[in-house]
Amino acid sequence: MNLEQLINVLGLLVWIAARAVSRVGPHGSGLVYRELHDFYGYLQLDLLGPVVAGNRSVRTWREQADRARGTFVRRSGLNTSHILPVGGLSGGSGTLPAGLYRPEEEVFLLLNRCHGPLSTPKSACLAEVGVANASFLSRFNVGDFHGASWENGTAPDGEPGVC
């Protein structure tokens, strides 16, 4: 276990203790499993395997299982929903799944070299953001998406990605 994982584990234990103490009183409802699960996912803990590279984000056991099944996670705050892949994107060390969305849904697609595609539906206009160790694809309507990849670093609308 490296230092980052140790700090995350200690933070998790402190959080569990604080939540448990705050809910012990006569009006307390106890520690809710869903809150614990969301917080665990938020910390990006991976206690089941080593970190392969120092600059990589640590995957959770849930993300590892999702990647093995060929699904990936769409996050909105601490709430997650899983999207089944359709087709795929070729990039880096393997094939990354695209996603199934309603045609009218506008999404952000982030091709992260560690986690694969992470996408967030948004109704508002979104600005481009540079992300370390990842390629960023501009916002687009899913109907316009025909398989951009890291290889050429271009987004579906022809704008360059940021690595």
Swiss-Prot record:
Keywords: Signal. The keyword Signal applies. It comes from the Viruses. Residues 1-22 form the signal peptide. Belongs to the HHV-5 US34 protein family. This is Protein US34. It comes from Human cytomegalovirus (strain Merlin) (HHV-5). The gene is US34.
